[in-house]
């Protein structure tokens, strides 16, 4: 039997009262420490409150230990509570070591594994608060901990404490918990009580902290993954909100499709966990659980899903949410029409009938969801542990018989630091990486010493395969028609070598002993030593290397001079037009920078033709209706040494932008988000609106006076009517039965490689297309096409693209003259989620001030004539009127 029949309707409600009944005063109740019970109407505990309560528990019980596991983005300690019996906690290090051995399976046979299983405990990860506005998650962790620590003579909890070691995260996002709670407290009792937060609840990426599961760009995701690798939990359970209305909780099984790189043991037990949870909730009189509807887990980068590629049972649930801690009453006539009859379905067995929904209800559902997982783990401890071992054992065996037998990343590439970064990402995900000695060969190719090899006969190598291979999303067209069905929840292709511009070779023959003898395991990637050769007036560094931009910005900050070579010059990557030329600082200073950024330099004579670069004044639009794309852009620019200044609505609406900025970047957002933002009455007055017509007028003035305006993806499309540009978005108004691409990697061809905008970009880069535009020029266009999709060729490299003929031969990126200035439109995200490193240069190349060459002569009209023509037109409203929050999907 997988679940327990309770004697009371809600375990959490009963146990919160047990202290007063049984006199367990030594274990403090939440109310005794916080002055409130988690789940109380109109009350939310912030991170300080939460940690204070957990420390009070740890001071009064030998069943809990607190550990600091890292720092948040804003520098707060991230803490976890480890809960089990006192006897188990006394042997915690031993159990962690055993869990790791079973998870990796490398030094065990079946009998040894079975022997370890008999004496081992099953480690479970449960958390709350990854998405901070899904507030019940953080509140439920306190209740769950209290229940586990205060139970007396409870067979279910006694079994859990004896068999399970719970790694309980009070929150995965301390900074975000504080932001949301303090915002709610500030507005409590006003008409803005349930207002949305007007900024990202993670400093840079907000909701996308659950899209960073393999790239590990953010500190919080680095900490979570490091801790997962330390504890090797068999189950990784992440609590989210909100469920598809009117369901009260969404639980596994997931919708299809699912990756074939996931172990069958994991796939089947994901279903078991979900069906058991459904039965457990029913037994506890908790109606409204639904499965399959809406959520698939095709994308590998969900933080709460990436662990499946390490053979963990990793999943999430979505509990119903109104807004913060404010209750709401629902009647059945508010339900979608098909749900108003309250009819039971196969995956919605006990429909919710409506009524009041309090934060306490959400907390109770989460507590019982967590208890169902702990109860299941306690009753199936040996099976779960042995399955974890078998999954690793079988993965190792599979890749000893089937290709790819290894992946090789040469350390001699157009952008070697990017190659090293890709190898380091594998290490950070728990994958063993080896450096080669001289003479290593594979597939008949000799690789330089220091190249990196990932043998696939290791326990977590499914992660490498998932990230390196091209994704092929299952057919999403209805048989015999062009109609799209079963459309994906998130992006469908993410192949990292393509995104990062790194050559990775799959080894098609088994590794033999002589090859393995030439490999040395590395824990941290060491890049080849940067070199300085030659003598000359300036030092040339390659424009093909992303890290060169870090070096350039550091040199400018030190008072150096930087220019772009307009004639071919020698660099460490070969002869190159567009190379950076560094001068004005000492040889020692340049040498120090080359070592810091692993970028080699060559001393050369100053070429006859150069373009002098200057540090630009960069403005990055930061709307109050938050843009995740803005946050990613800000993070990337800061990491590369640029100094963007946030531009808010009031800044854009003010005149004389050119007196303060040289370049303005508009991140991806909906047209309504750009123009209108939050409506009146939704948020306090200072956060209302978007750039508005005044802002567009001032952006026109800014560019006309010589400024550079850069726009990504949907915003690029919005600017066409707003600024009367002689460009058309060929996908405007096109329905999914004629074209669909929610996120895939597409090949483009570079036009005008001689232009500074394309310096360092490969001839045929791969871009992340995510529901963006594709362009064609109209009469009067004066400018240049920077990249276009191939003609009569499907540009798809990885993921799902329906009806590629709609964009074949169309423009992906362009630059056009506007008065004295320029506008750059990118119909994709060149900085997608901090992953698409190969296209960063499309953005970076535009972030310096210099005297740019004139645009190509094929244009018919002069910039002045075109500007006058554009100014004579009224700025049209954008055709699309999306919701400003349409990026904020729940999972």
Report the location of each language-model feature.
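Bacterial N-terminal signal peptides that target proteins for export
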Residues: 1-14
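Active-site-proximal cap/loop segments of hydrolase catalytic domains
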Residues: 177-202, 206, 222, 226
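Carboxylate/His-rich catalytic cores and anion/metal-binding grooves
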Residues: 145-148, 163-185
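Intrinsic-disorder/low-complexity accessory segments
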Residues: 26-135, 139-164, 211, 217, ...
């Amino acid at each position: 039997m997988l679940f327990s029949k309770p004697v009371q309707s809600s375990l959490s409600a009963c146990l919160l009262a047990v202290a007063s009944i049984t006199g367990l005063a030594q274990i403090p109740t939440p109310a005794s420490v916080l002055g409130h019970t988690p789940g109380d109407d109109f009350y939310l505990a912030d991170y300080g409150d939460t940690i204070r309560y957990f420390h009070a528990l740890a001071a009064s019980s030998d069943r809990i230990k607190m550990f600091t596991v890292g720092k948040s983005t804003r520098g707060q300690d991230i803490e976890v509570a480890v809960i089990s019996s006192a006897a188990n906690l006394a042997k915690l290090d031993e159990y962690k070591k055993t869990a790791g051995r079973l998870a990796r399976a490398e030094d065990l046979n079946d009998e040894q594994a079975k022997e370890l299983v008999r004496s081992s405990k099953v480690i479970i990860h449960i958390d709350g608060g990854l998405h901070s506005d899904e507030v019940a998650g953080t509140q439920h962790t306190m209740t769950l901990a209290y229940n586990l620590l205060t139970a007396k003579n409870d067979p279910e909890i006694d079994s859990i404490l004896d068999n399970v070691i719970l790694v309980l995260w009070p929150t995965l996002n301390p900074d975000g918990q504080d932001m949301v709670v303090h915002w709610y407290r500030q507005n409590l009792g006003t008409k803005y009580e349930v207002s949305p937060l007007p900024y990202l609840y993670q400093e840079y990426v907000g909701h996308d902290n659950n899209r960073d599961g393999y790239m590990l760009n953010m500190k919080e995701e680095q900490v979570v993954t490091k801790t997962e690798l330390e504890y090797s939990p068999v189950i990784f359970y992440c609590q989210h909100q909100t469920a598809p209305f009117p369901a009260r909780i969404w639980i596994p099984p997931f919708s299809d499709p699912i990756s074939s790189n996931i172990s069958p043991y994991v796939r089947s037990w994901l279903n078991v966990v979900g069906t058991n949870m459904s039965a457990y909730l029913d037994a506890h009189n908790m109606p409204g659980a639904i499965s399959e509807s809406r959520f698939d887990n095709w994308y590998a980068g969900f933080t709460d899903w990436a662990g499946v590629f390490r053979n963990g049972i990793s999943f999430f649930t979505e509990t119903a949410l109104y807004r913060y801690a404010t209750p709401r009453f629902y009647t059945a006539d508010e339900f979608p029409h098909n749900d108003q009859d309250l009819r039971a379905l196969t995956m919605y067995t006990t429909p919710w009938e409506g009524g009041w929904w309090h934060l306490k209800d959400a907390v109770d559902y989460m507590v019982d969801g967590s208890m169902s997982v702990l109860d299941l783990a306690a009753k199936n401890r040996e099976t779960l542990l042995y399955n974890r071992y078998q999954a690793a054992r079988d993965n190792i065996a599979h890749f000893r018989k089937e290709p790819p037998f290894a992946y090789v990343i040469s350390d001699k590439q157009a952008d070697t630091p990017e190659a090293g970064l890709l190898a380091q990402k594998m290490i950070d995900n728990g994958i063993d990486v080896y450096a080669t000695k001289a003479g290593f060969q594979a597939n008949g190719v000799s690789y330089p010493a220091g190249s990196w090899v990932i043998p696939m006969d290791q326990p977590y190598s499914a992660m490498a395969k998932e990230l390196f291979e091209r994704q092929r999303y299952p057919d999403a067209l209805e048989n015999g028609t062009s109609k799209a069905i079963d459309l994906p929840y998130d992006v469908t292709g993410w192949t990292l070598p393509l995104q990062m511009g790194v050559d990775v070779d799959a080894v098609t023959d088994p590794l033999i002993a002589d090859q393995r003898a030439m490999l040395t395991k590395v824990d941290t990637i060491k890049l080849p030593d940067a070199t300085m050769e030659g003598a000359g007036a300036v030092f040339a560094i390659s424009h093909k290397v992303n890290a060169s931009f870090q070096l350039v910005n550091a040199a400018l900050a030190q008072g150096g001079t930087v220019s772009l070579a307009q004639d071919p010059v020698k660099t460490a990557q070969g002869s190159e037009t567009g190379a950076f030329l560094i001068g004005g600082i000492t040889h020692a200073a340049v040498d120090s920078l080359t070592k810091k950024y692993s970028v080699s330099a060559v001393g050369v004579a100053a070429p006859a033709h150069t373009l002098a670069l200057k540090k630009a004044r960069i403005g990055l639009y930061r709307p109050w209706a938050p843009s995740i794309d803005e946050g990613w852009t800000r993070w990337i620019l800061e990491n590369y040494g640029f100094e963007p200044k946030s531009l808010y609505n009031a800044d854009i609406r003010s005149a004389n932008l050119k007196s303060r900025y040289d370049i303005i970047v508009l991140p991806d957002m909906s047209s309504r988000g750009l123009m209108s933002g939050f409506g009146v009455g939704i948020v306090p007055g200072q956060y209302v609106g978007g750039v508005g017509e005044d802002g567009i007028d001032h952006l026109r003035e800014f560019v006309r006076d010589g400024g550079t305006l850069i726009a990504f993806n949907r915003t690029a499309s919005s600017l066409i009517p707003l600024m009367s540009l002689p460009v058309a978005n060929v996908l405007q108004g096109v329905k999914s039965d004629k074209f669909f691409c929610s996120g895939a990697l597409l090949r483009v061809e570079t036009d005008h490689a001689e232009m500074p905008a394309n310096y360092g970009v490969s001839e045929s880069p791969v871009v992340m297309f995510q529901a963006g535009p594709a362009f064609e020029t109209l009469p009067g266009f004066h400018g240049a096409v920077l990249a276009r999709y191939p003609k009569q060729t499907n540009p798809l490299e990885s993921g799902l693209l329906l009806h590629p003929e709609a964009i074949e031969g169309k423009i992906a990126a362009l630059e056009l003259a506007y008065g004295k200035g320029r506008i750059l439109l990118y119909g994709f995200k060149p900085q997608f989620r901090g992953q698409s490193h190969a296209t960063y240069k499309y953005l970076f190349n535009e972030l310096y001030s210099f005297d740019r060459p004139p645009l190509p002569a094929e244009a018919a009209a002069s910039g002045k004539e075109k500007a006058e023509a554009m100014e004579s037109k009224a700025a049209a409203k954008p055709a699309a009127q999306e919701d400003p929050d349409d990026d904020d999907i729940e999972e």
